[in-house]
Amino acid sequence: MLPRPLRLLLDTTPPGGVVLSSFRSRDPEEGGDPGGRAVGGGQEEEDEEEEEASVSVWDEEEDGATFTVTSRQYRPLDPLAPLPPPRSSRRLRAGTLEALVRHLLDARTAGADMMFTPALLATHRAFTSTPALFGLVADRLEALESHPPGELERTTGVAISVLSTWLASHPEDFGSEVKGQLDRLESFLLRTGYAAREGVVGGSADLIRNLRARVDPRAPDLPKPLALPGDSPADPTDVLVFLADHLAEQLTLLDAELFLNLIPSQCLGGLWGHRDRPGHSHLCPSVRATVTQFNKVAGAVVSSVLGATSIGEGPREVTVRPLRPPQRARLLEKWIRVAEECRLLRNFSSVYAVVSALQSSPIHRLRAAWGETTRDSLRVFSSLCQIFSEEDNYSQSRELLMQEVKPQPPVEPHSKKAPRSGFRGGGVVPYLGTFLKDLVMLDAASKDELENGYINFDKRRKEFAILSELLRLQKECRGYDLRPNSDIQQWLQGLQPLTEAQSHRVSCEVEPPGTSDSPAARTPRPTLVITQWTEVLGSVGGPTPLVSWDRPSVGGDEVPGTPAPLLTRLAQHMKWPSVSSLDSALESSPSLHSPADPGHLSPPASSPRPSRGHRRSASCGSPLSGNTGEGTSRSAGCGGGVSGPGSSDCRIIRVQMELGEDGSVYKSILVTSQDKAPSVISRVLKKNNRDSAVASEFELVQLLPGDRELTIPHSANVFYAMDGASHDFLLRQRRRPSAATPGSHSGPSASGTPPSEGGGGSFPRIKATGRKIARALF
C-alpha cells in the first residue's frame, strides 16, 4: 500500500469513483454502523495508518449495572511514531431495570452501544411491562428537574427520540394501560417549558399528539378468522376443482397478510413458551392467528384425502365420502402440486403445512393410496420433505430464506411470458415454527437473571438478533402482488377440519390396521395389462358406463356395456392423468362432472385399478370377442382357452395356498410364456410372506373341473403345461412318492385319461391325441 502523502500527490481516482486502498471489518457494536463503517469524520483516515495489535476485555460494575469493556490497542504502521492511546467501548451486559433505563437515556449510548435501544424496546415485555418501563422513563426525567439545564435538556431530547422510535416500531405497546404515564410525561414537558420549545426537543408536541391518538380503550385490530359462522361446510374433495397454482396463490395471500400483521416481540420464548399457563390466554394473539392458519391448511389436507367433514366434536360426528385408493391418490397428487407451487412462491408456511399433513399418521398409513401415486409426485414430495429436514438445525430451509429473489424483467401485458395470475415481484412467508423453536430454546438455555439479580441483557441481545431476522422477512413479504379469488376463499372458509380423534378413526376405517401395516400391503404391485381375464372385462363393460380420467366425458357416443373404452385405456398402458393434466381438463372443459358426482374422481368401483408403483408392460394382444354378454356370464374358472399361434403369451392365474389353521389365501399371479414352475412358486411364496428359498419343498397343482387335479412338473413351463379349462391353482407341500390318486394327474404321461371335452389340454397332450386320431383314421 502506498504511503498516504504519496497517495495524495498521485490522484489517480477516476471521476465519480473511489479507489479502495485498504479496509478492516469493524464490530457494529463498537461505534460503527451495521455495515461496518466507522462513525466520525476522519476515523477511516486514521485507521489506514494503524494496525490492530491487541484486544483486552473485562467487566466493570457501575450503579447497579455490569458493563463489558473492550479495549483495542493499535500500533502505528510507522515504527517511529508514538503509540496512540487505547480505544475503549462499553456494552451493558446486565443490570437492574433502573440501570437499564439510565443507560437508555444516556446520550452516549447512541454512539457507543447502538443495539441497546432497539433490543430493549423489542424484548422488554419478557422481563417487565410497558407501563412499568414508561413509568421509569418519566421518573428519570422528573428526577433531573433539579439538575443543570444542559443535562436536563440533553436527557429530555434523548427521551423524546427514544419514545418516538418506540411508538414507530412498536405501536402495539401503547394502549389504555399507559394513559397515566403519558399524563405524567405531558405534565413534565409543560412544566419545564419543553412542550413549546423548538430545537432538540421540538418534536415533543408531535410525540404527545401521536401518543394520545394511540392511547384509547379500543381493542387492536386482529386478523379476521377464516371460518365464518353460519357457513355450510364445504366438501374437502372440491380441491380437485381448483388449479394448483391458483390455490397456492390464495394460500400465500392469506399467509402473507397474517405474517405482515405479526408482532415479532410476541414470538419471544418468555411469552410464547408460557402461553398455556393459566391467565395467559390473551398473550401473543398475532402468533396464535398464524398458527391457526397453519393448522387450518393442514386440516384441509387431511380432510380432503380422507374425504371426511366434521359436523361436531365427537369422534363419530363425521360425514365420510366413500373413496377408493385411486381417488385418494389423485388428492395426494393435487396437494403435492399445491405445495410445490407454494414453494415457487416462497410461501414456506403453507409448504410445511401440506407436507406435515401428508406425513401425519392418518395419511401416511394409507399405503394403498400412496401405492397408487405417480413416481413424479412422490419424487416432488420427497424433495419438499427434505427442505424441512431437521438435519443441521433446518439448515436447508434457512438457506432458502436467505436467498434473495432476482427481480423479474418487465414484460408486456399481453406477452406470453407474463407472470401468471397476478404474481409480481418476489415476497416470502417463512415457516414461523422455526423461529419460535429458536426463541423457546434460547429462553430455556439462558437465565433471565444473573446470580446477583441483574437482568441478563446479553440474552436479550441474542433474542433481538432473531427478531431482527423476522423484521427483515416482513419487509421482503411486502413484495407480493396477489389478487383474491372469491371462490377459493369461500371454499377455504367453509372447511371444517377433523379433530385428531376423528381423523384417526376415519383413517382406520379406510384401511384397517391389519391391512395397511402388513408386509404384503407394503410391497408395491406391478401394473398389469389384462386381456384374457374375461370376468374383469365383462364387469367393466357391464351396465355401468366407464368414466375416462384422461378427458371429460362428452356423452352419448359410447354404448354402455362395450369394452371399447377399456381397450383404449389399455392401449395407452393405463396412464392416468397427473394433476397438471387434470387442471387443464378442468379449465378447458365445461362438461366435467360436478364435484358432487363421484364419477369425476375415478373409474367405477367395478374397474380394477392397477398400481401406480412400478409399471411393467406385457405383450397381450389377443382380440376380444365382441359378444359382451358371453364375456359377462363367464366365470374366471372356465375362461382362457388353448394357447396357440396368434393368442396371448400371458395369463392371470389364481393361486390358493394352504396356511394350516389360518385357512387359505388366494393370490393373483401373472404367468408368461417364459415362466417355469419354480419361478411361479417363488413368487407365490413371496406374496404370502414366505421364504422363497424353500420353493423346492412345494408343488403347484392346477384345480380342474370335477374335483380333478393336475400337478405341474417342477421343470415344466406353467404357461404351456396348464389346462386351459381352469385358472385356479393350489400351492402345497410336496408329497412323498406314492400311488397316484384316482382322478388326479401328475403330468401328460401319468394318466391315460383324456382331458374333458369342455376344456383344452396342454400342448404335448394335444400332440399325443392327434397321433392317436391319425393312426385310427389311416
From Swiss-Prot:
Tell me where in this chain the Ras-GEF domain is found: 243-513
Report biased composition (Gly residues) as residue ranges. 33-42
Q: Which Pfam families match?
A: RA, RasGEF, RasGEF_N
What does the UniProt keyword field contain? Guanine-nucleotide releasing factor
Domain N-terminal Ras-GEF residue range list: 88-212
Polar residues bias: start-end ranges: 620-632
Q: Does the keyword Chaperone apply?
A: no
Q: Where is this region: Disordered?
A: 1-59, 503-524, 541-564, 581-647, 735-769
Q: Which residue intervals are annotated with compositional bias (Low complexity) in the record?
A: 1-15, 581-592, 738-756
Molecular-function GO term, any one: guanyl-nucleotide exchange factor activity
Give the protein's function. Probable guanine nucleotide exchange factor. Putative effector of Ras and/or Rap. Associates with the GTP-bound form of Rap 1A and H-Ras in vitro.
Question: How is this protein named in the record?
Answer: Ral guanine nucleotide dissociation stimulator-like 2
Organism, as annotated: Mus musculus
